[in-house]
């Protein structure tokens, strides 16, 4: 199995009842239902040109507009056949896009990766993560591309990638 499949099974194959506990935070474009009028009023932001987090932004927009999201059990099948290298590259673009969305104020801490980033930032541990990125990110990337199917390692790699971005919150740069 591919890295994409392993991640999909672990992160996307979550029952609707569990995702419904925090409906906007767990938003994904393949398993929700909203009123047609709501969708037309709050459609996906066409200005996003980079891969990744279009659905995250859409979910946040719905939350800010106090719109109800109903999660449904709708299995996702990834038929694109991305190699592990292609999947990691897409993930990197998605994290870079997420950083841009955070900087522009469109994404808040309801997004789990950003919430972890902010917690590390507040506690002063982000500097350690940034050092770990310098020391280990390329090795971890090689492991992921080379066949390691660890969701934990993949999530850590995403955090390392995000820590490479300067994200200004308030008057300070991080």
Task: Describe the residue ranges of each PLM region.
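Conserved donor NDP-sugar-binding/catalytic core segment of glycosyltransferases
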Residues: 1-5, 68
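Short, hydrophobic alpha-helix immediately C-terminal to the catalytic nucleophile
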Residues: 59-63, 160
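Non-catalytic, C-terminal membrane-associated alpha-helical segments of glycosyltransferases
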Residues: 93, 110-174
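A recurrent flexible, glycine/aromatic-enriched loop bordering the glycosyltransferase active site
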Residues: 14-34, 49-51
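Acidic donor-binding loop at a coil-to-helix junction in glycosyltransferase catalytic cores
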Residues: 50-58
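Short, well-ordered alpha-helical scaffold segment located
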Residues: 37-40
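Active-site donor/metal-binding and catalytic loop motifs
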Residues: 65-89, 94-105
């Amino acid at each position: 199995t591919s890295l994409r499949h392993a991640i999909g099974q672990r992160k996307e194959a979550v029952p609707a009842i569990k995702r419904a506990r925090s409906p906007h935070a767990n938003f994904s474009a393949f398993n929700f239902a909203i009123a047609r009028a709501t969708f037309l009023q709050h459609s996906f932001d066409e200005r996003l040109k980079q891969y990744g987090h279009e659905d995250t932004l859409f979910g946040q927009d719905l939350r800010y507009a106090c719109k109800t999201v109903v999660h449904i059990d709708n299995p996702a099948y990834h038929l694109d056949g991305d190699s592990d290298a292609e999947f990691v590259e897409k993930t990197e673009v998605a994290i870079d896009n997420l950083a841009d969305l955070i900087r522009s104020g469109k994404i808040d801490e309801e997004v789990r990766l950003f919430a972890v980033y902010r917690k590390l930032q507040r506690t002063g541990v982000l500097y350690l993560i940034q050092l770990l990125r310098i020391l280990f990110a390329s090795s971890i990337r090689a492991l992921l591309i080379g066949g390691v199917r660890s969701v934990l390692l993949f999530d850590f790699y995403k955090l390392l990638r995000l820590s490479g971005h300067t994200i200004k919150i308030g008057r300070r740069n991080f």
